[in-house]
């Protein structure tokens, strides 16, 4: 018996732990399985999470164990989405949880507080919402908690674990005050509360955090003053509270913090003096105090004992006055000094040459005088020298040309005179040169033609003369050229057309003449062309219509003639068009109404005639419309009132007739209206009194107006001259009383009563007529229905003739031997061969299913393989119309679209389309496979070629006046050479009866995640909606993120922008692109691709580029042998 009891206890000792271990392991497996079931896993990252594996769960991806218990979960950047399961509380031994950079949503589960052994939690850059759970206080071992970049809200909980060392809740929407209880986190080393909506003051109790090294409070709504107690944080290394509303002075004690390296307090309301202690700290290297209201810097009694390591000092845009602080020149460690936008006066001290490590010196927008001291040449490392907006004088020093490290030299808005020194030729690294608004003279400085790195050149507002040299084309990197306000003469050199990077060209207010060279129409990126105030002649350049990026055109005050080109209507991004003071004739082209971004249209003082086109009402953003001093006639179109943004309307000195439209009362933003010197008649509409009090100028003089001036209008406009020249006009402010107004009023009243009586009688007679008509119609329909019923009964024996009609139709579409044949553009294939090749349209041969039917793989006996699309039964398009549309569609050919090779149309309602077979599937499958193989199958060059191929194909469709309507990865197919082909285009033509193609029903506007916002709202597809869809596909190619992975509040576009704003560029990289070197050209090309994607997905359709622009940008994004030319748009040879 004793032996049995002993054996029993031995059994318990040996097997009880094993049973306990098995139970705990199973509980952890169950918890992780529940966690997985909550998630969407597009990359299949959790496929290894199988309970049947030998060491489950310790051999699962991302799961770490210690002594067979789960202690770590690491699943970053795997595109996981869904809620974090409450069952995670079953992992009682968990020490580290890392789910960062995914798409988790919902709230942080309260049950996480049961994982009491947690040391670190990384949940940053997800889409989590709600509040921080108060139960977090139970995580008594927690050291790191990072939830940055989510959508968390509410107040910061008071009871956070006192064990915390790193707390980052930045980039959320937390509100309320910073809790003083944070002072209890005595082990805290990093506290990041930036980019939230926190209010109130910074609690002084934070000064108790002796271990705190990093305190970031930027971009909140904090007020009050900086607490002096923060100076007790003796371990503080980085203190940043920029972009708040903090005021008062900076405590001098901050300068005594022994380890402080960075102090950033810019964009606040600080005032008073800057304490000198900040410049006497050996550890402090960066001080940023710009955009405040400081009035002075405390001047030291002596700097003998002052040692500092300061490298960056930013005091820009304050109110500091007096002479430049001489003692600053003793801070020999300075690399960046910015005191621009202050009130400094006097001369620049020669001692500034002591700062030999200086790389950036910005003294712009002060009141400095004198000459540039020669000692500055001792600062040999300077790459930015900005003295713009002062009162410096003398000649530009020759020695500046020998400071070869200079990249930015800005001396504009001073009083420099003389010539540009020839030594400038040595500044080969110079990128920006601003010498505008000085008194420089001579001819165009030819020395500048050697500065091939220049991207911006401003010589405006000087006294240069002579011709603009042809050699200006040497500046091939130039994007901004401003030569306005000089005395240049001669013609614009045609070589300017070679400056392909030019975005702004300003040659205004000169003595230039001749015609505008046609080469200017070949500048692909130009947005601004300003040629006003010269003597240019010839016709208005029609070639400008091809400059799709053009936003501002000013050709006023020249001698241009001819008509306004109708093709200007293609300039959809045009914001301002000014052609005033020329000799332009003809009529105003109604096509201008297509320039939907137009805000300013100035055509004054020309020879325009004809009517004012009502199409101008289609300009919703129009603010200034000036058509004065022309020969326009006809009535003022009342539709102009639809341009509700209009604030200035000038139609004076024309031959306009008719009345002033009463609808003008809807122009609530109008401040000026000039209708003087015309032939307008009638009264001034009383409704114009409804125009807001913003109206300060109203001129209707010299017309044929009559009646009383509306009282409220007359009291607001007191100048009699603005109503003069209208002999029958009376009332204020004119000195003419409206004496007959009472009698006329009675006459009008009697006339009104008579009209009301007549209208009532007419309405009664009309209602009688309608009743009689309806009665007659109903009686006629009843009789017709009886006749048709009788006829049907008589014809019923003939119903079987339908079969004979089908057979007859079949014989007409057969070959000579009677077998139906497919219409092929390059080959002969019979229907029987096709049915056999698809195995009777067997389910196993289905390649894809869309709303346009099934796509089958067809294997013919001769080895040829094609794709056959069978359109849905019941197609409403009749046979003849289907054939006509298919013939047209078969002529649409390009190397990057799936070309229609043939078709079949015959009874019973069978419609087939023949395409080349694409053996390498579609883009959606390819991206999914790439993610499973860590992306190595899709490197950067291949992704770029795919994107470029799609862009070329879509661009060709748009040039062919076709809109796709459903651009998505599933509709991008790949041939044997992995060339991209766009499929499923033009099929609406073959399935919709209506000849109108402009309106598309809501179920055909595209695919969720890829369809543009405006297409979703309007139900209409356009080129712009295609471009938006392409942008989404491009971002998916580059980032590997599928649009459907995101929540309703955040889409892929917002996600990409958020990562860029945070500087988290690596988060955008698809796993296969992680090997890109940030210093390589491929990295830059990738970023350019991202920018193209964001341009295509702009919220306003008018801000999106055309597909030809996209192709141009993508071709320029990667230049090399791996980018084939797009010059050959023809399709590739087909096996069919």
From Swiss-Prot:
Residues covered by the Protein kinase domain: 841-1123
LRR repeats: 93-115, 117-139, 141-162, 163-186, 187-210, 211-233, 235-256, 259-280, 283-304, 309-330, 333-355, 357-379, 381-403, 405-426, 429-452, 453-479, 480-500, 501-524, 525-546, 549-571, 573-595, 597-620, 621-643, 645-666, 669-691, 694-716
UniProt cross-references to InterPro entries, sorted A to Z: Kinase-like_dom_sf (IPR011009), Leu-rich_rpt (IPR001611), Leu-rich_rpt_typical-subtyp (IPR003591), LRR_dom_sf (IPR032675), LRR_N_plant-typ (IPR013210), Prot_kinase_dom (IPR000719), Ser-Thr/Tyr_kinase_cat_dom (IPR001245), Ser/Thr_kinase_AS (IPR008271)
Bilayer-spanning residue ranges: 752-772
GO CC list: plasma membrane; pollen tube
Extracellular compartment residues: 23-751
Stretches with biased composition (Low complexity): 799-815
Entry annotated with the keyword Transit peptide: no
EC number of this enzyme: 2.7.11.1
Positions of post-translational Phosphothreonine modification: 830, 838
Family to which the UniProt record says this protein belongs: Belongs to the protein kinase superfamily. Ser/Thr protein kinase family.
This protein's name: Probable LRR receptor-like serine/threonine-protein kinase At4g36180
Protein source organism: Arabidopsis thaliana
Lineage: Eukaryota, Viridiplantae, Streptophyta, Embryophyta, Tracheophyta
């Amino acid at each position: 018996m004793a032996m049995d009891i002993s054996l029993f206890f031995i059994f318990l000792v040996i097997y009880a732990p094993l049973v306990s271990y098995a139970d705990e392991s199973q509980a952890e497996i169950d918890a992780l399985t529940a966690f997985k079931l909550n998630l969407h896993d597009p990359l299949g990252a959790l496929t290894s999470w199988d309970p049947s594996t030998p060491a489950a769960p310790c051999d699962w991806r991302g799961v770490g164990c210690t002594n067979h218990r789960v202690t770590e979960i690491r699943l970053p950047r795997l595109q996981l989405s869904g809620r974090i399961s409450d069952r995670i509380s079953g992992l009682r031994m968990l020490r580290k949880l890392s789910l960062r950079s995914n798409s988790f949503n919902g709230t942080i589960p309260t049950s996480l507080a049961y994982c009491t052994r947690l040391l670190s939690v990384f949940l940053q850059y997800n889409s989590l919402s709600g509040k921080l759970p108060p139960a977090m206080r139970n995580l008594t071992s927690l050291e790191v908690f990072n939830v940055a970049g989510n959508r968390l809200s509410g107040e910061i909980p008071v009871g956070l674990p006192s064990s915390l060392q790193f707390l980052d809740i930045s980039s959320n929407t937390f509100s309320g005050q910073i809790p003083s209880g944070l002072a209890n986190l005595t082990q805290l080393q990093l506290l990041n509360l930036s980019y939230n909506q926190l209010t109130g003051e910074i609690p002084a109790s934070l000064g108790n955090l002796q271990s705190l090294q990093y305190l970031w409070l930027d971009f909140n709504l904090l007020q009050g003053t900086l607490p002096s107690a923060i100076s007790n944080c003796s371990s503080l290394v980085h203190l940043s509270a920029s972009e708040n509303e903090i005021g008062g002075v900076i405590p001098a004690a901050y300068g005594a913090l022994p380890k402080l390296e960075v102090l950033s307090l810019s964009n606040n309301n600080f005032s008073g003096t800057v304490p000198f202690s900040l410049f006497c700290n050996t550890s402090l290297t960066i001080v940023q105090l710009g955009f405040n209201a400081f009035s002075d810097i405390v001047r030291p009694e002596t700097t003998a004992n002052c040692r500092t390591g300061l490298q960056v000092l930013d005091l820009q845009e304050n109110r500091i006055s007096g002479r430049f602080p001489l003692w600053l020149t003793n801070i020999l460690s300075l690399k960046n000094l910015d005191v621009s936008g202050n009130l400094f006066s006097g001369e620049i001290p020669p001692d500034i040459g002591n700062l030999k490590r200086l790389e950036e010196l910005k003294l712009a927008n002060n009141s400095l005088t004198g000459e540039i001291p020669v000692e500055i040449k001792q600062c040999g490392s300077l790459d930015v020298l900005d003295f713009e907006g002062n009162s410096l004088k003398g000649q530009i020093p020759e020695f500046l040309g020998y400071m070869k490290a200079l990249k930015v030299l800005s001396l504009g808005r001073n009083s420099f005179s003389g010539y540009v020194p020839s030594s400038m030729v040595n500044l080969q690294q110079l990128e920006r040169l601003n010498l505008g608004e000085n008194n420089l003279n001579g001819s165009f400085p030819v020395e500048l033609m050697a500065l091939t790195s220049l991207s911006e050149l401003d010589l405006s507002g000087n006294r240069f003369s002579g011709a603009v040299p042809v050699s200006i084309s040497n500046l091939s990197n130039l994007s901004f050229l401003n030569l306005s306000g000089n005395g240049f003469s001669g013609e614009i050199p045609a070589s300017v057309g070679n400056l392909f990077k030019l975005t702004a060209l300003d040659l205004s207010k000169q003595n230039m003449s001749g015609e505008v060279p046609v080469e200017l129409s070949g500048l692909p990126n130009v947005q601004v062309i300003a040629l006003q105030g010269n003597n240019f002649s010839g016709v208005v350049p029609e070639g400008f219509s091809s400059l799709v990026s053009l936003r501002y055109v000013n050709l006023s005050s020249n001698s241009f003639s001819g008509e306004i080109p109708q093709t200007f209507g293609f300039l959809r991004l045009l914001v301002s068009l000014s052609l005033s003071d020329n000799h332009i004739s003809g009529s105003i082209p109604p096509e201008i109404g297509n320039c939907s971004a137009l805000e300013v249209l100035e055509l004054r003082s020309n020879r325009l005639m004809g009517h004012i086109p009502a199409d101008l009402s289609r300009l919703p953003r129009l603010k200034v419309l000036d058509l004065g001093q022309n020969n326009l006639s006809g009535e003022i179109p009342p539709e102009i009132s639809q341009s509700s943004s209009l604030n200035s309307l000038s139609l004076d000195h024309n031959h306009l007739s008719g009345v002033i439209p009463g609808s003008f009362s809807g122009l609530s933003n109008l401040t000026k209206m000039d209708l003087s010197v015309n032939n307008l008649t009638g009264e001034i509409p009383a409704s114009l009194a409804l125009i807001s009090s913003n109206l300060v100028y109203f001129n209707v003089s010299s017309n044929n107006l009559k009646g009383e001036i509306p009282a409220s209008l007359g009291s607001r406009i007191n100048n009699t001259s603005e109503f003069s020249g209208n002999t029958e006009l009376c009332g204020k402010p004119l000195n003419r009383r409206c004496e007959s107004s009472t009698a006329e009023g009675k006459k009008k009243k009697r006339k009104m009563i008579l009209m009301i009586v007549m209208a009532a009688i007419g309405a009664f007679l009309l209602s009688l007529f309608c009743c009689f008509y309806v009665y007659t119609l109903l009686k006629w329909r009843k009789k017709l229905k009886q006749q048709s019923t009788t006829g049907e009964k008589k014809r019923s024996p003939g119903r079987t003739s339908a079969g004979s009609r089908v057979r007859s139709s079949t014989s007409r579409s057969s070959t000579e031997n009677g077998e139906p044949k497919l219409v092929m553009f390059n080959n002969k294939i019979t229907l029987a061969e096709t049915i056999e090749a698809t195995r009777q349209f067997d389910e196993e041969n289905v390649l894809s299913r869309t709303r346009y039917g099934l796509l089958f793989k067809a294997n013919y006996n001769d080895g040829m393989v094609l794709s056959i699309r069978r359109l849905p039964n019941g197609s409403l398009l009749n046979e003849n119309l289907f054939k006509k549309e298919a013939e047209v569609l078969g002529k649409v050919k390009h190397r990057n679209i799936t070309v229609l090779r043939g078709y079949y149309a015959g009874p019973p309602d069978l419609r087939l389309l023949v395409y080349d077979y694409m053996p390498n599937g579609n883009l959606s499958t390819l991206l999914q496979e790439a993610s499973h193989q860590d992306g190595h199958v899709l490197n950067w060059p291949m992704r770029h070629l795919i994107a470029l191929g799609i862009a070329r194909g879509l661009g060709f469709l748009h040039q062919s006046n076709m809109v796709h309507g459903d651009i998505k990865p599933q509709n991008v197919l790949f041939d044997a050479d992995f060339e991209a082909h766009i499929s499923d285009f033009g099929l609406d033509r073959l399935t919709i009866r209506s000849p109108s193609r402009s309106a598309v029903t809501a179920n055909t506007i595209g695919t969720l995640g890829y369809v543009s916002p405006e297409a979703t709202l309007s139900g209409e597809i356009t080129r712009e909606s295609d471009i938006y869809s392409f942008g989404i596909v491009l971002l998916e190619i580059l980032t590997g993120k599928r649009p459907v992975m995101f929540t309703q509040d955040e889409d892929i576009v917002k996600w990409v922008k958020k990562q860029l704003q945070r500087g988290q560029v690596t988060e955008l990289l698809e796993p296969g692109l992680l090997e890109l070197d940030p210093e390589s050209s491929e990295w830059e090309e990738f970023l350019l691709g991202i920018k193209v994607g964001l341009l295509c997905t702009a919220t306003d359709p008018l801000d999106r580029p055309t597909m030809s622009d996209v192709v141009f940008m993508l071709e320029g994004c990667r230049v090399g042998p791996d980018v084939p030319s797009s010059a050959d748009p023809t399709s590739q040879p087909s096996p069919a």
